[in-house]
Amino acid sequence: MLSFLPHSLRGVLAGFLLVINTLLCFSVLFPLSLIKLLPIKPLQVLCTRLIIRIAEFWISCNSGWMALTGNIQWDIQGRERLDYDGWYKFFLKQELIWVPIIGICWWALDFPFMKRYTKAYLARHPEKAGQDVETTRKACEKFKTTPVAVFNFLEGTRLTSAKHAEQQSPYRHLLKPKSGGVAFVLDAMGEQLRSLVDITIHYPDGSPTFWDLLSGRVRKVVVRCQIKPIPTEMLGGDYQQDEVFRANFQRWVNSLWEEKDLLLDQLHQDYPPGH
């Protein structure tokens, strides 16, 4: 709609709208998050519903400024199998709760925060073994009566040519997947998770930066969503201590990555630059 404006001006305008939208929504969400602390179940349920509506409004406003300052063509397949009433959450590192404004929003929206101990830490404190999984399992008790899905970014970092070469990745379009995080989630919530939503994103004109998005330089985004079952043998194993289970789990994750790499190959052919 504002395509007649220079990209730099559109970027500044979009950034301003994003900040204003976030601050206004937070000003309403924060009091509700405090009220939600009261140990009154009906009140907590009501606050949760209102907070979710605020989050949906925030997303709608973000979609609005993206349409205003840009003209992205979305090609999405598979979203019809997603359930609007389901809960799609990210497992977040505990340190992220301290991110200004957004950390409180994540907490208020019941995004589970996880704290994982490194091998070096466990070597110094063996008594802590298993406590991180148990803590996460307790944090997820609230989801036993609520449909929930957990997002996990297996590559763990943004793909660059340098990182791809450094890893000597066997995949054309992907970095090597890190299976520890998803194994941790399945160990903590295995009884509640039976399938995974495999999301693949392709940018025909190359991976954009956040500034590219703000300034209206993103032309097209191709998204493919696939529902895949989680093998029962991948549930309930001890990824940290059981070497056989860890090898089998990594093999399963690698097979998912091989399929994703082939899909990206096809998407690159079907949606070349400028398509």
Language-model features: where?
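A Trp-anchored, charged/polar loop motif used as the substrate-binding/catalytic surface
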Residues: 128-141
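A generic local structural motif
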Residues: 75-78, 136-138, 183-184
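Accessory terminal regions of nucleic-acid processing enzymes
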Residues: 19, 236-275
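Exposed, interaction-prone extracellular/peripheral surfaces
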Residues: 141, 185, 269-273
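A cross-family acyltransferase "interaction/gating" segment
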Residues: 100-119, 144-238
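Flexible, glycine- and charge-enriched loops at secondary-structure boundaries
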Residues: 51-52, 129, 171, 175
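N-terminal membrane-anchoring alpha-helices
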Residues: 1-71, 273-275
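Catalytic core of membrane glycerolipid acyltransferases/transacylases, capturing the structured
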Residues: 33-60, 68-71, 77-127
